[in-house]
């Protein structure tokens, strides 16, 4: 069973979803992940970086989707992204544009990784989120540009 959030619930959830990627305090980041994600929630990076694709192809493997599942794995994923992009103070993740609702308690949102120095966009992505009965993210399919 899925939960279709109200507009207020959706705004709060998306704000916390973005906040987890920018949160400098490890325990607060872990708490945000538990609030945002269902216990068995998963994120699938649909279009992994070229290096991952090339390595898989070299072994004769099909194009791999990269997936993390559960709070502990998600904490590692979010923490690594924070360390790589945000911790230095160079970038911040922000929602860009409007959230688009889809039938069946799913939404799509666009985010950007913005330079704190000059405001330019250094990266972006599209997330398609589906929710569990408690209104937490059950699945996230991420497309990174």
Predicted features along the sequence, with ranges:
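C-terminal and inter-domain tail/linker signature
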Residues: 1-145
């Amino acid at each position: 069973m899925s939960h279709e959030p109200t507009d207020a619930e959706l705004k709060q959830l998306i704000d916390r979803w973005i906040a987890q990627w920018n949160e400098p305090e490890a325990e607060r980041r872990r708490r945000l992940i538990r609030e945002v994600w269902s216990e068995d929630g998963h994120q699938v990076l649909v279009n992994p970086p070229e290096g991952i694709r090339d390595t898989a192809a070299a072994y004769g493997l099909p194009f791999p989707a990269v997936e993390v599942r559960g709070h502990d794995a998600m904490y590692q994923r979010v923490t690594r992204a924070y360390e790589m992009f945000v911790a230095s103070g160079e970038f911040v993740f922000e929602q860009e544009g409007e959230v688009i609702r889809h039938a069946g308690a799913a939404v799509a949102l666009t985010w950007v990784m913005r330079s704190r120095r000059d405001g330019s966009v250094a990266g972006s992505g599209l997330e398609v989120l589906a929710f569990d009965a408690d209104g937490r993210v059950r699945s996230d399919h991420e497309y990174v540009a």
